[in-house]
UniProtKB/Swiss-Prot annotation:
Biological function: Participates actively in the response to hyperosmotic and heat shock by preventing the aggregation of stress-denatured proteins, in association with DnaK and GrpE. It is the nucleotide exchange factor for DnaK and may function as a thermosensor. Unfolded proteins bind initially to DnaJ; upon interaction with the DnaJ-bound protein, DnaK hydrolyzes its bound ATP, resulting in the formation of a stable complex. GrpE releases ADP from DnaK; ATP binding to DnaK triggers the release of the substrate protein, thus completing the reaction cycle.
Top-level taxonomic group: Bacteria
HAMAP family found in the cross-reference section: GrpE
Species, as recorded: Parabacteroides distasonis (strain ATCC 8503 / DSM 20701 / CIP 104284 / JCM 5825 / NCTC 11152)
Protein name according to UniProt: Protein GrpE
InterPro entries: GrpE, GrpE_coiled_coil, GrpE_head
Compositional bias annotation for Basic and acidic residues: 1-14
A single BP term in Gene Ontology: protein folding
Family: Belongs to the GrpE family.
Keywords: Chaperone, Cytoplasm, Stress response
Cell location: Cytoplasm
Predominant place of localization: cytoplasm
Cellular component terms per the entry's GO annotation: cytoplasm
Length: 194
């Protein structure tokens, strides 16, 4: 063995001490990192649990909303079918008194000797019926003397106009047309002058 001088010994001792200090520092850092990782994994697992809980809540809410919407859709379809089936019920109920009037008129026609009284009764029933239709928004289309318009009229015949200013105008109405709130529900069948 060679002898070391005292300065070399100090240097070696200093180097060994530095190495030992570095190893200790590295060991402390590794322990600190391991503790951080353990704490981090606890945080991650806590976050995963929280996210899983939130997912389950949202999924449950979504399923409930889907079921609620499906029930709503079925209910509205049922209500719509009922409305289509019985939608005219109110209008038909209001026609029943007019039908009763017609029945009474028919009973009186058979026994009546006064034709004028029967005619007057039928006129009253007709007026009552037309009044009801008017309340419902149904109105007759005025045709005679008006210029022919395909939106309101259906020409079933043309005849020579009796006067020159009647050309292209309605001369006669064979069947009355009707509107429902200004929408034509039946065109008037008319004779037009040419």
């Amino acid at each position: 063995m060679s002898k070391m001088n005292p300065n070399e010994k100090k240097e070696n001792a200093s180097k060994n001490e530095n190495v030992n200090n570095e190893e200790a520092t590295n060991l402390q850092e590794e322990q600190s990192n391991a503790a951080d990782e353990a704490a981090g994994s606890d945080n991650v697992s806590g976050e995963v649990e929280a996210l899983q809980k939130k997912y389950n809540e949202l999924n449950d809410s979504h399923l409930r909303l889907m079921a609620e919407f499906d029930n709503y859709r079925k209910r509205t379809m049922r209500e719509k079918a009922d409305l289509i089936k019985t939608g005219g019920e109110g209008a038909l109920k209001n026609l029943l008194p007019i039908i009763d009037d017609f029945e009474r008129a028919l009973q009186n026609v058979r026994a009546a000797e006064d034709v004028e009284a029967v005619k007057e009764g039928v006129d009253l029933i007709f007026g009552k019926f037309m009044g009801y239709l008017s309340q419902q928004g149904v109105k007759p289309i005025e045709a005679i003397g008006k210029p022919f318009d395909t939106e309101e009229f259906e020409a079933i015949a043309t005849i020579p106009a009796p006067e020159p200013d009647m050309k292209g105008k309605v001369l006669d109405c064979v069947q009355t047309g009707y509107t429902l709130f200004d929408k034509v529900i039946r065109h008037a069948k008319v004779v037009v002058g040419e």
